[in-house]
Amino acid sequence: MGSGFYAQLRSLLLANGCVLVRQGKGIHEIWRNAISGKNFPLAVTVQSRHTANGILKDAGVA
């Protein structure tokens, strides 16, 4: 799997109704918020908490 914050982000996203849509290019995955229908990318190598917070914001979770 990834390193850094990936496992925590994945758990939070799944707990909040987000689903993995497909594998993106390289180290990215494309996820969808089931409530809003919005797609967003998630890198499997998230090292910064600021990046992790930005992903949660894009996902509509934070």
What is each residue range found by the language model?
Residues M1-K25, R32-A62:
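Basic nucleic-acid-binding interfaces
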